[in-house]
A protein has these predicted regions:
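Gram-negative and organellar
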Residues: 1-298
Length: 298
């Protein structure tokens, strides 16, 4: 399946501006330049994705899923923040005859190794390459909920410098439930991970939690929402700035409406906020977007 989308976005922080009035360096306080504070902007969104499902003709229904996407976000004013990304992933699904983990009482367990490659370009210059391997174990529990347990390792290479290059090791656990009688779906996910870089002050531990809710509405509209919170503590003091501890919150709302067999409309609203003990990392903003999608390519 192929999907092509074109959209528009308004953001209150198009220049990735600082949400603070001063910066503390040692015992000194420096005023933040007004041009470094957040400013609004509009951008155009482009996205193409291709997904392929290879049936392995296995009695249990094993398959391989391939996915590729290209996305671009081009700003009207702050073009230095134009961003492009490429994603390629491969996922192999093994439908198991029995549950191999007794502490999960699962029905229809599935084991899924996954490889995900990411490339990010900022203003026509590559800034990041990432290679992630994950091992997922999923199925249905006795209470009717769906469960997903995942271990992952993510190798990151930043073009800006070798000190930040490193790897994430993490685990996540989540469940989703169907609300009786309403077709609503709700769930949660817990994340525990650490990052080990070439410089000790880039080491951190991250703890996160997500809550999600989705529900079909009248006239074929589909509503979905997600709240996520992350708490990230660095192991060592940052040079000049001292202790770094970040708390990040994101709230997403989305409305999707199919139009016929080939077209769909997508409206999104995202609120973000980052609180940090170092003022230059404080950020906040909101994005409002609208996209048109087409998916009937031959």
């Amino acid at each position: 399946q192929q999907n092509l989308s074109l959209g528009w976005k308004h953001t209150t922080n198009g220049n990735s501006g600082i949400n603070a009035d001063f910066i503390e360096i040692g015992d000194f306080l420096l005023d933040v330049d007004p041009e470094s504070k957040r400013e609004g902007d509009q951008s155009t969104l482009y996205n193409y994705s291709l997904s392929i499902d290879q049936d392995l003709n296995h009695p249990r229904g094993d398959n391989i899923q391939y996915f590729f996407s290209y996305g671009a976000d081009r700003f009207n004013t702050y073009s230095q923040f134009d961003i492009q990304s490429n994603v390629f992933s491969t996922r192999r699904n093994f439908h198991l005859d029995e549950n191999y983990f007794s502490f999960f009482n699962l029905e229809d367990p599935v084991f899924s190794p996954n490889i995900n490659l990411l490339r990010v370009v900022l203003n026509r210059e590559e800034i990041l390459r990432s290679g992630r391997i994950s091992l997922d174990y999923s199925g249905q529990l006795d209470d009717g909920s769906s469960m997903l347990f995942s271990y992952y390792r993510d190798e990151k290479t930043f073009k800006s410098g070798g000190q930040k290059n490193g790897r994430i090791n993490g685990i996540s656990f989540g469940q989703s439930y169907v609300w009786p009688g309403s077709q609503a779906l709700y769930g949660y996910k817990i994340i525990l991970e650490n990052y080990r870089a070439n410089a000790g002050f880039e080491f951190y531990e991250n703890y996160g939690i997500e809550f999600s809710y989705s529900q079909p509405l009248k006239e074929n509209w589909q509503f979905s929402s997600k709240y996520s919170y992350q708490d990230k503590s660095h192991d060592e003091d940052y040079p000049l700035f001292g202790d770094r501890h970040d708390q990040m919150e994101t709230l997403r709302f989305n409305l999707l409406k199919p139009i016929g067999a080939c077209w769909s409309l997508n409206f999104g609203w995202v609120l973000t906020g980052t609180h940090s003990t170092i003022n230059i990392y404080k950020r906040s903003g909101s994005n409002l977007s609208a996209q048109v999608n087409y998916q009937c390519f031959k």
